[in-house]
């Protein structure tokens, strides 16, 4: 998993509340088990018409936000059915940080497991970032995970909280497999010890 230390990029505003996982990545795109290739279908039913043409007014179709790295969203983001494809699609598009007043628990946890930093902030601070994000290509925001600080286009800063263990994993690029491999020697030693103490297993 790619490390997350400091992220600087355009922030895209999506102030809708209750954006569910089917809106993030519709069910017809869940057949794949690959983490790549889903970015083009992120928010598919909002980004495209039924005949596949781009909806020009949708935020990620606007020239200023096509390369957005940060998404500033509304409350209860990622609600609905559990699907890990949702953070896969967000990450494959190029977004590595989602900021919102609240998240659905499963989506929130899945983000950390896939190298995406979800940040919960009070509504008034999210509103400030939404105002900043509406500047288009001038909406350059920096997220410093080590310092736990967001810096807006005007130089103002906002502190945020993050679980220390999840912070450690993101800073070091550790997913569940990476964490397991860190303990490979201890796992091997345990297996050898068990063979001796319990050979019938």
Curated annotation (Swiss-Prot):
Q: Which HAMAP family match?
A: LeuD_type1 (MF_01031)
Q: What is its EC number?
A: 4.2.1.33
Q: Which cysteines are joined by disulfide bonds?
A: none
Instruction: List the keywords (alphabetical).
Output: Amino-acid biosynthesis, Branched-chain amino acid biosynthesis, Leucine biosynthesis, Lyase
Which GO molecular-function terms appear in the entry?
Answer: 3-isopropylmalate dehydratase activity
Taking the record's annotation, the residue ranges forming a coiled coil are: none
* Class of this enzyme: lyase
Pathway it works in: Amino-acid biosynthesis; L-leucine biosynthesis; L-leucine from 3-methyl-2-oxobutanoate: step 2/4
**Homology family:** Belongs to the LeuD family. LeuD type 1 subfamily.
User: Can you supply one Gene Ontology CC term for this chain's record?
Assistant: 3-isopropylmalate dehydratase complex
- InterPro entries assigned to the protein according to its UniProt record, in alphabetical order: 3-IsopropMal_deHydase_ssu, Aconitase/3IPM_dehydase_swvl, AconitaseA/IPMdHydase_ssu_swvl, IPMI_Swivel, LeuD
Q: Where are the transmembrane segments?
A: none
Indicate the quaternary assembly: Heterodimer of LeuC and LeuD.
Q: Which Gene3D superfamilies match?
A: Aconitase, domain 4
Which named protein is this?
3-isopropylmalate dehydratase small subunit
Q: Which reaction does it catalyse?
A: (2R,3S)-3-isopropylmalate = (2S)-2-isopropylmalate
């Amino acid at each position: 998993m790619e490390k997350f230390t400091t992220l600087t990029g355009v922030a895209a505003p999506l102030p809708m509340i209750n954006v569910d996982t089917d809106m993030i990545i519709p069910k017809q795109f869940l057949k794949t088990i690959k983490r790549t290739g889903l970015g083009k279908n992120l928010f598919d039913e909002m980004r495209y018409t039924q005949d596949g043409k781009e909806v020009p007014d949708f935020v990620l179709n606007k020239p200023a936000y096509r390369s957005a790295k940060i998404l500033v969203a509304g409350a209860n983001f990622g609600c609905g059915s559990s699907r890990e494809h949702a953070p896969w699609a967000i990450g494959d598009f190029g977004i590595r940080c989602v900021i919102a007043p609240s998240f659905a628990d499963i989506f929130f946890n899945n983000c950390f497991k896939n190298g995406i930093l979800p940040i919960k902030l009070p509504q008034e601070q999210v509103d400030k970032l939404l105002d900043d994000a509406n500047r288009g290509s001038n909406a350059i925001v920096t997220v410093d995970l080590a310092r736990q600080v967001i810096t807006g286009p005007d130089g103002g800063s906002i502190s945020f909280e993050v679980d220390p263990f999840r912070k450690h994993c993101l800073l070091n690029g550790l997913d569940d497999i990476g964490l397991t491999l860190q303990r490979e020697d201890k796992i091997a030693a345990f297996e050898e010890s068990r063979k001796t103490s319990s050979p019938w297993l």
